[in-house]
Curated annotation (Swiss-Prot):
Reactions that this protein is recorded to catalyse: (2R,3S,11R)-aszonalenin + acetyl-CoA = (2R,3S,11R)-acetylaszonalenin + CoA
Source organism superkingdom: Eukaryota
InterPro entries: CAT-like_dom_sf, Sec_Metabolite_Acyltrans
Record protein name field: O-acetyltransferase anaAT
Length: 509
């Protein structure tokens, strides 16, 4: 189907230029009695979406600068655009359960991962060719549909991907005679890019944001990322888990009760305490996963108290990277529905000993190894310290910080990006992207489940969208670890106290 689409080419914002050149991808599951009947609805929805937001039909490319400086990261229209370029429809004579079980299998001999046939594009695009910035694949099964979505990370962050899903849902449920109720417009997106590219009149300090590394070129960066990911996917295990909401709430309450004592015990500044004298559910979940992964990576931490750690662990550090949505942190704030990248990286580094057992733990007793120690006040204070540190860093990301960050990126003589080897652990939190609230209309309804299939980088975690209509729904997340670490973590008493394997994706029924 040839579609007439027109828009002016545009250069991405400063923040767009920081993102890793790959596709953010998710899968949405719809259980349906008549899945074939829903295909025309989705096809029409994608068509209406690109008519209303024509830049979504565009392609990303890096263009050499005429002055030999940084490459220009451009989104441009496609000549003779056809809908099939961004929408693929595949029919599978299998059930949803069959495909979920199939996707559990790791790749072998470096081949494609089992979910790749269900995705519109590979995770890593060909750097020598223009790349569509959006793609959809409708996978039709005997009892439902898996809608796979891919958005180019140099154009959109996870919040933007969620907004694209919500706008597609609006195009599907809206009657053909009505204009769909979209959350954004081309003009709004252009204004957001302008805001995210405003530069302060301050000198460039190359040491100001060390978490962003200089790149020789976008092409060499593509090749480096591709080599690193393809070389690891045979040794990494990706699994889906859940945590009950009431367990998270209980842990959060305990942390918040302990903050005054914790601030006093560790001699933290009162000024800091006033500004961040609380922790959120997100902080607690991040701290819990960070703790459990370190216990699995370094068994001595789980088995010994601080004073019993070997010198290499006693003096080691652990770092966590968390992309932070800055839309609401700017002044004035950007609309929540802004599609383009609006994130910066929070980087927290702490001594590894913060995750060790309480100093009084009796390691002569077998029960100490089997206990999770989370009921111990000393353990809880140390855990609270980790969660509190994350909250303090988050509270420091304000309008001034973001403006300095944007200016730093703009004034850098070369492109910058986050590389996945700069931190021990990355946690990408998609709780607020609204995918479970996306109503596609009577035939499809709202997604039953979602997942991010693209872990396969050691220590990469995706926290899935929340269900706003059900506050008691468990938290869902995907995690990728080395096989040996995954084997240890699922037998850790602390992990087992809070975390369960997601039966939808990994169950037998």
């Amino acid at each position: 189907m040839t579609v007439t689409i027109s828009f002016e080419p545009y250069v991405g914002s400063s923040v767009d230029a920081l993102s890793i050149p790959l596709y953010l991808r998710c899968q949405l599951v719809f259980k349906l009695s008549k899945p074939l009947a829903a295909v025309p609805l989705l096809e029409s929805g994608v068509n209406r979406l690109v008519q209303a937001l024509p830049f979504l039909s565009g392609e990303f490319t890096a263009v050499p600068a005429s002055d030999g400086g940084k490459e220009i990261l451009l989104v441009r229209p496609v000549l003779n655009f056809e809908l099939s370029r961004i929408l693929k429809i595949k029919y599978h004579e299998t059930s949803l359960r069959h495909v979920c079980k199939q996707m559990n299998r790791p790749s072998s001999q470096g081949g494609d991962l089992p979910h790749e046939p269900y995705m519109p594009y590979p995770r890593l695009p060909d750097p020598s060719r223009p790349q569509p910035i959006v793609g959809f694949q409708v996978n039709v099964h005997t009892d439902g549909i898996i809608l796979s979505v891919a958005t180019h990370h140099c154009s959109f962050d996870a919040t933007g991907m969620g907004s694209i899903v919500q706008n597609l849902a609006a195009c599907c449920r809206s009657p053909p005679s009505d204009e769909p109720d979209l959350t954004t417009s081309p003009a709004q997106e252009a204004e957001a890019r302008k805001v995210l590219s405003q530069v302060r009149e301050t000198p460039f300090d190359p040491k100001m944001f060390p978490e962003y590394r200089p790149l020789d070129s976008m092409l060499s960066y593509y090749k480096g990322v591709q080599s690193a990911l393809q070389g690891r996917q045979t040794t990494i295990v990706n699994r889906c888990f859940t945590i009950a909401a009431d367990k998270i709430n209980a842990l959060k309450r305990r942390c918040n009760q302990l903050i005054p004592e914790m601030v006093k015990k560790y001699g933290l500044s009162t000024e800091d305490a006033i500004g961040s004298a609380w922790v959120s559910s997100n902080d607690v979940v991040a701290a819990l996963l960070w703790t459990c992964i370190n216990r699995a990576r370094y068994p001595e931490i789980r088995e010994r108290s601080v004073h019993q750690l070997p010198p290499d662990l006693l003096h080691a550090t652990s770092s966590l990277g968390v992309p932070v949505n800055v839309r609401s942190r700017l002044s004035p704030p950007l609309p929540k529905s802004t599609l383009g990248n609006a994130v910066c990286l929070l980087r927290e580094k702490v001594p590894l000993q913060f995750f060790a057992l309480p100093s009084h733990a009796n390691m002569e007793a077998t029960s100490s190894v089997c206990a999770d120690h989370s009921g111990d006040d000393e353990w809880a204070l140390s855990f609270c310290r980790v969660a509190y540190g994350l909250r303090a860093k988050l509270n420091a990301i304000d309008d001034d910080y973001i403006r300095d960050y944007i200016s730093y990126v703009q004034k850098s003589p070369c492109h910058l990006s986050v590389t996945l080897d700069t931190e021990n652990l990355y946690l990408s939190n998609w709780r607020e992207i609204g995918v479970y609230d996306a109503d596609f209309g009577g035939m499809l309804g709202k997604p039953l489940r979602m997942r991010a299939p693209d872990g396969y980088t050691d220590g990469l975690i995706f926290v899935m969208a929340q269900r706003s209509e059900d506050k008691s729904a468990p938290w869902e997340f995907n995690i990728s670890l080395e096989a040996s670490t995954m084997k240890r973590i699922v037998h850790d008493p602390l992990w087992c106290k809070y975390v369960e394997l997601d039966a939808f994706w990994h169950g037998e029924e």
